């Protein structure tokens, strides 16, 4: 079976994210993948990434609406928004059909406020 190209993999990632399917999401990452949402510390490894998604979905109703999705070689770039108006951008490095590295840019303070979550005081 051919390995999915970055754009196709990220399209499947968005569908799994919107279903809050942590098992499907985790399966898209390499065992030693890194997920770095710049508002947070990097998350290392597939199981830790699965736990990150579980915690996120338990805390807030998250939906990813694709604005633009680009592919360049091993990279996919996702520009997104959510129903509350939050916007962000994600970079996915896909190697042999799995996400090896992901970096996301979004406004954490706006996210916390929109979802009524506590704002850290550090």
Describe these PLM feature segments.
Residues 1-122:
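C-terminal and inter-domain tail/linker signature
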């Amino acid at each position: 079976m051919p390995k999915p190209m970055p754009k196709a993999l990220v399209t499947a990632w968005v569908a799994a994210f919107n279903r809050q399917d942590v098992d499907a999401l985790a399966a898209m990452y390499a065992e030693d993948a890194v997920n770095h949402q710049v508002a947070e510390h990097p998350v290392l490894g597939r199981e830790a990434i699965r736990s990150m998604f579980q915690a996120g979905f338990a805390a807030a109703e998250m939906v990813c609406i694709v604005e633009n999705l680009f592919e360049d070689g091993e990279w996919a770039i996702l520009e997104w928004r959510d129903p509350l108006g939050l916007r962000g951008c994600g970079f996915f490095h896909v190697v042999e059909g799995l996400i090896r590295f992901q970096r996301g840019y979004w406004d954490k303070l706006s996210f916390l406020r929109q979802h009524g979550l506590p704002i850290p005081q550090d």
